Curated annotation (Swiss-Prot):
GO molecular function: 4 iron, 4 sulfur cluster binding; metal ion binding; rRNA (adenine(2503)-C2-)-methyltransferase activity; rRNA binding; tRNA (adenine(37)-C2)-methyltransferase activity; tRNA binding
Gene designation: rlmN
Protein name stated in the entry: Probable dual-specificity RNA methyltransferase RlmN
Disulfide bonds: 104-331
Cofactor: record remark: Binds 1 [4Fe-4S] cluster. The cluster is coordinated with 3 cysteines and an exchangeable S-adenosyl-L-methionine.
One Pfam family hit: RlmN_N
Length: 342
């Protein structure tokens, strides 16, 4: 059975041609699936009964089941656990900003990158998600929380470790006949898979790129993020400069401040030296506490010191506001707790 949500518009056009139907049927079906949120072929009333019968025999339109939903009493952030068709569990988050609602989407069940501060990495990667499973997260959040205007691929998993399905997902949600979410309202976050950064730059998309950096030197970054052994900072910075030169777009560098680990004054100056001259923005993140890992977030005084050093060097910098801290909003936390209790 074909899941129609796994198809870009072009792929769906080919699908209809291959089953002896007109190419324009794809736009009709896209309108029903993404415009009207219909999954039952019998409700697609401008499609002939014969075609509806044919589709029921060979295709379906997926939906995600919300297994659990937790609402923050602090800031209206909502954390979702979704049940996949094969019984696996993934997480999604809905976040309210002044500019609209953002869906934080997972790209894998678990993660292989083994970053030492991330709950998603505990237990490793189970499998990649299909494009449809990413699309379904956005649509489920949209239906439950309110219209989604922005997407961040910052949930569980490494997007560039599932590159092809992530690119397909972007095409589907970006298509005006699909969800119609603008490229500049979509952000991909990567821990730094260098060959994929070059490939992504060559796609010439207007999608935002965010790099999970978290350390200003190789020794510390390798301790925190094993990916740095394969792609050390010199290689990563070359790839980032290539991306900026190719796309003329700014990169955001994510830097989680961990008490006593990467929050010293010397680290701030090293970060400035690493990034000075690049078209970039630094997003400082007071790290979410994860019980199994034990890291604590840097205190506010150190966060502000770090920010001041960066801004004094002429680099754009913000501190990400804490969201959903009362509902275990750190990536991987809620899923891990659910699996333990099940």
């Amino acid at each position: 059975m074909y899941n129609l949500k796994d198809m870009t518009l072009e792929e769906m056009e080919e699908f209809f041609v291959n089953i002896g139907e007109s190419r324009y049927r794809a736009k009709q079906i896209y309108k029903w699936i993404y415009g009207k949120k219909v999954t039952d072929f019998d409700q697609m009333t401008d499609i002939s009964k014969n075609l509806r019968s044919k589709l029921k025999e060979i295709a379906y339109v997926s939906q995600l089941k919300i297994e659990e939903r937790r609402v923050s009493e602090i800031d209206d952030t909502v954390k979702y656990l979704f049940l996949l068709e094969d019984g696996n569990i993934i997480e999604g988050v809905a976040i309210k900003y002044r500019f609209g609602n953002t869906a934080c989407v997972s790209t894998q069940v678990g993660c292989n990158m083994r970053c030492s501060f991330c709950a998603s990495a505990i237990g490793g990667k189970v499998r990649d998600l299909k494009a449809s499973e990413m699309v379904d997260q956005v649509m489920a959040i949209d239906s439950d929380y309110g219209k989604i205007s922005n997407i961040v691929l910052m949930g569980s998993g490494e997007p560039f470790d599932n590159y092809d399905e992530v690119m397909k997902f972007i095409k589907i949600v970006n298509n005006p006949h699909g969800l119609g979410i603008g490229s500049r309202h979509i952000t991909i976050s990567t821990c730094g898979i260098v060959p994929k950064i070059y490939q992504f730059a060559d796609e010439k998309l207007q999608v935002n790129l965010s790099i999970s950096l978290h350390a200003p030197n190789d020794e510390l970054r390798t301790q925190l993020m094993p990916i740095n052994k394969a792609y050390p900072l010199e290689e990563l910075m070359k790839a980032c400069k290539y991306y900026v030169d190719k796309t003329r777009r700014r990169i955001t560098f994510e830097y989680s401040l961990i008490e006593g680990v990467n929050d010293k004054k010397e680290h701030a100056y090293q970060l400035v030296d690493l990034l000075k001259g690049m078209l970039c923005h630094i997003n400082l993140i007071p790290i979410n506490y994860v019980r199994e890992i034990g890291f604590k977030k840097a205190n506010n005084e150190k966060v502000m010191m770090f920010k001041r050093i960066i801004e004094d060097a002429g680099i754009s910098c913000t501190v990400r506001r804490e969201l959903g801290s009362d509902i275990e909003a750190a990536c991987g936390q809620l899923r891990r707790k659910y699996l333990k209790e099940r």
